[in-house]
């Protein structure tokens, strides 16, 4: 508990600093100057000559908007200007619906949207920017009783249409923002505002249940830290007051109302199942508080969206789920970054690309500039070779057609590559024995550390350690050194045949790359609580991956000595495993710094079965390497060849019969 408390204090502090300094850091990102803009270029990450950056300054306005129920919401409007004089002709508006304060006061100065160079290119090119604090946050009145509730979403509709109705707006409205600010865009789209014409959601989630409790495993640390962060944001007098409230009377009154808000961790802790009900709001949060539950409505809106995602985000799988399920004109970029990059080099690359791509996107959809963005392949993704040696690839569909699902089976070792509980072998050869198994006494100290993809999603560091220490406390299955590069691009799926001396348990599976020095590098992960293993038809396109409904009625305990199969996907990835390196799968039953696994005494013993009948394995989407392909029936070419032979035989037989009849 002491370690978690220290970690949270560090995260809370780092987030506060980030909120203040982000604008200054992003000023290193810029588009080509007008002198460079002689030729017309529009391609991924590069844009010039299509629209003019004729505004050199901007002016902030702010006020309260009164919602249908009387709640007042604070909003900032940043209008482009030339030499300080506001442009009077109507312009498109791009706005944010934020949980993290629309503006803050630092050393007596208001920091707002105009201080971020993510927004400055848009302001310079003739877009009005706006940001509104969601109810119960910032300088807005009200209390916060849940995440992405129907009240908050209806507010978004009203704000959007108010913006469109103003004399300085030309009727074209878009939305831009990341994380919470990305999700509120999708929720706004579900209400189908007539004037909302384009979205640019950055690192947004799709399925709320999978984020909080992926396959039943409770990642409480993420929710707990976020709750403490937002509680601090809501009750400190740091949010900027609206203009006219210089004595902060209204701001202080709003903050008093915030004290009635409910912490997210208190809402979600008792909600164990996807069909759990929140009695306070009479809602089913996992079904009603997030985009997945409104897929049909979002599709009916037809609003184009550019999805911006990261391979190490906490919501990586959500990105491709949204891409497959939303039917409006769309694009997706999946880069080699986390939710909120802390490395300056990585952050500069990502934010620089966002600045360019968002301008291209809004120029096309809000201003009608035919810059060709919709003629390009809709999918851009990094193929990673280490954290920073990345190559951009494009695709027309996802999963990519070049990736072949290949089974990698678990075998007895040793490999000599790690001092784990079993040091097993990972191979494309299927087991032939009838009794293969590995036993494992659960170690509740296993952890991926305190700088994970989940930590980073709430402002923490992103820096996975050498995974060897964690590997040594779990079951591992490692290949021999690779004879050639192996590219894995897509969604790995784990199939574990397990039994336990306990009635339930959490299982964590990690895909890792072991270098020639023996250092084990984190690639991706997945998790499942054994009692949630029942498979169901998904309510949305789940990309062919196993779907666990996780209703309360679906829960099935374990019976000692009776193996069952756990099938679940890992976060997708695109990673080249270098020649001479090894592919490793590590299995543990706890991640103490990130997930809340009930500890039993004595710790249970897990048996992982790996024989010819119950062959535990992972399915890896392999590009350009030999592997045992998942049995998908006879290959199409073979089927076509057999069909051709049958047709020929029928024709020959028919001709022979006609000759016999003719002779008779």
Please place each PLM-identified region on the residue numbering.
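C-terminal, loop-rich substrate-recognition/catalytic regions characterized by aromatic stacking residues
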Residues: 47, 348-659
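Accessory cap/linker subdomain of secreted extracellular hydrolases
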Residues: 48, 112-116, 124, 190-300
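Cap/lid segment of the alpha/beta-hydrolase catalytic domain
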Residues: 84-164, 515-516, 592
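Glycine-rich nucleophile elbow surrounding the catalytic serine of serine-hydrolase chemistry
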Residues: 178-187
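Short beta-strand/loop motif that positions the catalytic acidic residue
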Residues: 307-309
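Active-site-adjacent alpha-helix of alpha/beta-hydrolase-fold enzymes
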Residues: 317-331
């Amino acid at each position: 508990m002491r370690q978690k408390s220290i970690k949270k204090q560090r995260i809370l502090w780092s987030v506060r600093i980030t909120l203040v300094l982000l604008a200054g850091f992003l000023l290193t990102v810029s588009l080509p100057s007008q002198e460079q803009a002689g030729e017309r270029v529009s391609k991924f990450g590069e844009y010039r000559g299509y629209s003019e950056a004729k505004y050199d300054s901007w002016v902030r306005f702010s006020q309260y908007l009164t919602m249908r129920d009387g709640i007042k919401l604070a909003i900032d409007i940043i209008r482009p200007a030339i030499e300080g004089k506001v442009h009077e002709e109507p312009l498109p508006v791009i706005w944010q619906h934020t949980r993290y304060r629309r503006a803050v006061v630092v050393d007596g100065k208001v920091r707002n949207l105009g201080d971020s160079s993510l927004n400055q290119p848009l302001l310079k090119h003739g877009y009005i920017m706006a940001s509104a604090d969601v109810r119960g946050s910032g300088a807005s009145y009200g209390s916060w009783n849940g995440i992405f509730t129907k009240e908050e979403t209806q507010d978004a509709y009203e704000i959007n249409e108010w913006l469109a109705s103003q004399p300085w707006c030309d009727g074209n409205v878009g939305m831009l923002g990341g994380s919470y600010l990305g999700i509120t865009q999708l929720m706004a789209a579900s209400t189908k505002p007539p004037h909302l014409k384009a979205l640019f959601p950055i690192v947004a989630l799709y399925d709320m249940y999978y984020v909080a409790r992926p396959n039943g495993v409770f990642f409480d640390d993420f929710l707990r830290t976020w709750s403490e962060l937002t509680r601090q944001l809501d009750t400190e007098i740091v949010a900027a007051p609206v203009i006219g409230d210089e004595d902060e009377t209204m701001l202080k009154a709003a903050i008093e109302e915030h004290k009635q808000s409910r912490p997210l961790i208190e809402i979600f802790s008792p909600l164990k199942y996807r069909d759990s009900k929140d009695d306070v709001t009479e809602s089913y949060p996992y079904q009603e508080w997030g985009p997945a539950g409104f897929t049909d409505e979002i599709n009916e809106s037809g609003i184009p969206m550019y999805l911006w995602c990261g391979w190490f985000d906490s919501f990586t799988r959500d990105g491709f789920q949204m891409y497959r399920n939303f039917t409006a004109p769309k694009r997706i970029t999946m880069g080699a970054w986390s939710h909120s990059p802390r490395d300056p080099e990585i952050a500069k690359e990502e934010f620089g690309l966002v600045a360019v791509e968002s301008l291209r996107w809004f120029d096309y959809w809000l201003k009608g500039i035919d810059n060709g963005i919709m003629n390009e392949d809709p999918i851009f993704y990094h193929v990673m070779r280490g954290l920073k040696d990345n190559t951009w690839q494009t695709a027309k569909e996802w999963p990519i057609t070049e990736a072949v699902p290949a089974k990698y089976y678990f075998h007895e070792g040793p490999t000599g590559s790690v001092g784990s509980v079993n040091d097993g072998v990972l191979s494309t050869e299927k087991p032939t024995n009838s009794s293969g198994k590995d036993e494992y006494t659960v170690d509740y100290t296993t952890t991926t550390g305190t700088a994970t993809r989940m930590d980073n999603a709430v402002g923490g560091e992103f820096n996975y350690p050498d995974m060897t220490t964690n590997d040594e406390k779990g079951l591992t299955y490692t290949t021999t050194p690779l004879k050639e590069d192996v590219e894995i691009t897509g969604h790995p799926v784990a199939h574990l045949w397990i039994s336990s001396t306990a009635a339930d348990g959490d299982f964590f599976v990690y895909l890792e790359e072991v270098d020639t020095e023996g250092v084990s590098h984190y690639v991706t992960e997945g998790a499942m609580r054994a009692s949630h293993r029942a498979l169901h038809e998904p309510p949305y396109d789940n990309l062919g991956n196993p779907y666990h409904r996780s209703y309360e009625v679906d829960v099935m305990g374990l019976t000692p000595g009776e193996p069952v199969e756990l099938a679940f996907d890992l976060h997708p990835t695109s990673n080249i495993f270098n020649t001479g390196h090894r592919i490793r799968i590590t299995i543990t039953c706890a991640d103490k710094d990130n997930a809340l696994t009930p500890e039993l005494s004595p710790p249970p013993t897990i048996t992982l079965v790996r024989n010819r009948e119950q062959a535990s394995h992972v399915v890896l989407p392999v590009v350009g390497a030999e592997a045992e392909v998942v049995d998908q029936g006879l290959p199409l070419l073979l089927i076509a060849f057999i069909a051709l032979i049958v047709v020929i035989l029928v024709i020959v037989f028919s001709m022979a019969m006609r000759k016999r009849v003719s002779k008779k």
